Amino acid sequence: VYKRQSKINHHMKKLISAAEAAGMVKDGMTVMIGGFLGNGSPHAIIDALVESGVKDLTLIVNDTAYPDKGCGRLIAGKQVRKVIVSHIGTNPCTSEQMNSGELEIEFCPQGTLAERVRSGGAGLGGVLTPVGLGTIVAEGKQIINVDGKDYLLEKPLRADVALLGASLADRSGNLVYKGTSQNFNPLMATAADLVIAEVRELVETGAIAPEAVRTPGIFVDYMVAPAK
């Protein structure tokens, strides 16, 4: 991962606190949060969001984690209006609020969810997929026939804010993820108007080998680094 430091003077990303990051998330916003059952999630920022009391959020997430972990804390606190998600089974708060009508759930198969986020980041009009044909996933969606085969048109997803969790970053905002903590983070970094990365370790620009970077700093607006 590491290489010899460069002496080139690069643009430095602004470091902010978790509370400052949470303050950029306003009531009613659409927010992407990286993570897979909490792995790779920006936990300090999520804690700050819980403290802030922000509400009526729409979350775009792979899963709703657990009531006491990851984005599930926001659902447990009833700060979320809608979730676009592939799995909710590990968080009973999600299903309880769904069944009571307090929380709107838009289920999306995991691979399709990833492609919709990727499409949003790439500026595409959507993605064609056979996944979900003939199921409730297809309800209300356009079916397009290509060479005699039907596909669902899944529209792109974008967010007001993306909150990422990274293992390592340099001061230019280049991000590295350890193992499966990568999950949805790199895709989400491309598909939001404002991107904030919470990083476990911060190094000087030039300390990360270019081939190790999974999210280039050009996508990152702010970083939340561990307190020293």
Where do the language-model regions lie?
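Low-complexity, intrinsically disordered or signal/transmembrane-proximal segments
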Residues: 5, 10-11
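Conserved small/polar residues in nucleotide/adenosyl-binding loops
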Residues: 1-5, 162
